[in-house]
Amino acid sequence: MAQFDVYENPNSGSKEIYPFMLNVETDQLGVLDTTVVVPLCRLETLKKPARHLNPVFTVQEEMYCMLTQQISGISNKNLGHTVTNLSSCRSEILAALDFLITAV
């Protein structure tokens, strides 16, 4: 598991709304059985993303919005296959997390 990996959401109850989960946890905690993720939803689902809180990324040729306000810890067993890595968007991801916590 790598920081900023995007995983399929295998949960049949939520994968239609949140098809992907973004791993935001540092690689240095890879020994844990859990990880911290932020769900991604299709841009059209959210309608109007908050400017600093909900950055938009391309995953599998579609636009997805990071729902930073829904950050959570989950078991690694609850993640599907890795589909991409968003390390190239590191600044936007960290800025959204920082805004959630400090509003800066």
Stretches found by the model and what they are:
Residues 13, 43-44, 63, 72:
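Residues that cap or initiate secondary-structure elements
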Residues 1-2, 30, 70-74:
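Short amphipathic alpha-helical segments, especially helix-boundary/capping motifs
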Residues 1, 15, 87-91:
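A generic "functional-site adjacency" signal
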